[in-house]
């Protein structure tokens, strides 16, 4: 396989399997609680455990890939995801569900860190924002697919059938990675030269880029985590509130790749990034003033625009020999912010007594992300 777009298709499929696996617990929560006699708090912990390993393994993941090769490490991550899925499928105790979830999330960390770097290797210098927009879209696409299919599969065959489906999708991603994927010609074997820790301007750039990505995703989390509660406070029924909030995710499947494509076409990805952040913040404000279906439709059509240009930032600040460890730094910051921000929002909402605080926090996070983007642009101009 020598086509960048064919390689991107393999990477997209593997990451889609990861998103599908992540969504299993949330989509089938009542079935997990019925089987294991747990409550919503336990379910929330099980959901969050998938991302928790990122705080530990994101940074070393880049070094591991540098030593053993990108494709081998990603394939190993998929094997760990399959093993975690197998434990959850066959495990009868809650402790085994926790173990399986942690293992699956550990494998997912390796995919997130290394495959992003692999996309940058294939598309460095051309169509990078477009490729990153498509690649990032695998996450909402996988979650949307899980929301659609898993309840139907569970209704027909029970919880085990749904868990097995997720595991089979991971196996399919593993097969594609081992049988169909090849490393880009510029990096045979998927390894990079030694001495690849980013330094000086590159280190500063990747630190800023990681914070921008984490803050942006934190703002998105405000919609999906607290949107239903906010709408219920404003008088919507729970089913209606959940449906409106999930619509943002479905529309993001369109806006995420669109942002990357537009940024590459007009050759101003940072302009698309900043406009998308500003537009997303405006929709938060509109939702606070007058929450309605059209506002959330507009939010879905705008909120994904910054994703591709943000994910293209590491490829622009890192040299090829620094990408492996640089992406580890990038995703360590992402996992940090994603661990802190939802908990912070929940605590603030509880203290104030309204989920509207989450949307106000979302505006602040987007403003900080925009300031970080402007700072990174100025930093790169000074370093040039």
Regions found by a protein language model. Name each.
Residues 133-181:
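Helix-loop-helix hairpin linking two adjacent transmembrane segments in secondary transporters
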């Amino acid at each position: 396989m020598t086509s960048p777009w064919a390689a991107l298709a393999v990477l997209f499929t593997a990451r889609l399997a990861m998103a599908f696996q992540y969504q299993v617990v949330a989509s089938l929560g009542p079935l997990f609680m019925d089987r294991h006699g747990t409550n919503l708090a336990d379910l929330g912990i099980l959901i969050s455990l998938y991302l928790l390993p990122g705080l530990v393994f994101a940074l070393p993941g880049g070094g591991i890939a540098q030593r053993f090769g990108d494709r081998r490490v990603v394939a190993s991550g998929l094997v760990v995801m399959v093993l975690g899925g197998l434990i959850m499928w066959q495990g009868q105790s809650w402790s085994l569900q926790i173990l399986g979830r942690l293992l699956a999330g550990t494998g997912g960390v390796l995919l997130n860190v290394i495959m992003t770097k692999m996309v940058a290797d294939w598309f460095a210098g051309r169509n990078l924002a477009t490729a990153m927009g498509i690649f990032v879209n695998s996450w909402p696409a996988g979650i949307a697919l899980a929301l659609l299919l898993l309840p139907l599969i569970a209704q027909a065959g029970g919880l085990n059938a749904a868990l097995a489906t997720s595991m089979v999708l991971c196996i399919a991603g593993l097969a594609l990675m081992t049988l169909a994927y090849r490393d880009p010609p510029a990096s045979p074997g998927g390894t990079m030269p030694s001495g690849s820790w980013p330094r000086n301007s590159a280190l500063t750039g990747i630190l800023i880029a990681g914070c921008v990505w984490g803050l942006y995703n934190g703002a998105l989390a405000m919609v999906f985590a607290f949107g239903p509660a906010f709408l219920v406070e404003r008088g919507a029924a729970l089913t209606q509130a959940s449906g409106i909030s999930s619509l943002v995710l479905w529309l993001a499947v369109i806006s995420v790749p669109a942002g990357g494509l537009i940024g590459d076409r007009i050759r101003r990805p940072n302009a698309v990034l900043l406009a998308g952040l500003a537009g997303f913040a405006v929709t938060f404000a509109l939702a606070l003033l007058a929450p309605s279906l059209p506002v959330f439709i507009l939010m879905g059509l705008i909120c994904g625009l910054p994703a591709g240009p943000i994910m293209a930032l590491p490829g622009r600040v890192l040299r090829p020999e620094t990408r492996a460890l640089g992406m580890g730094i990038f995703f360590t910051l992402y996992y940090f912010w994603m661990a802190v921000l939802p908990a912070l929002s929940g605590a603030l909402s509880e203290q104030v007594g309204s989920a509207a605080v989450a949307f106000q926090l979302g505006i602040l996070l987007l403003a900080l992300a925009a300031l970080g983007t402007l700072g990174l642009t100025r930093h790169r101009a000074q370093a040039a």
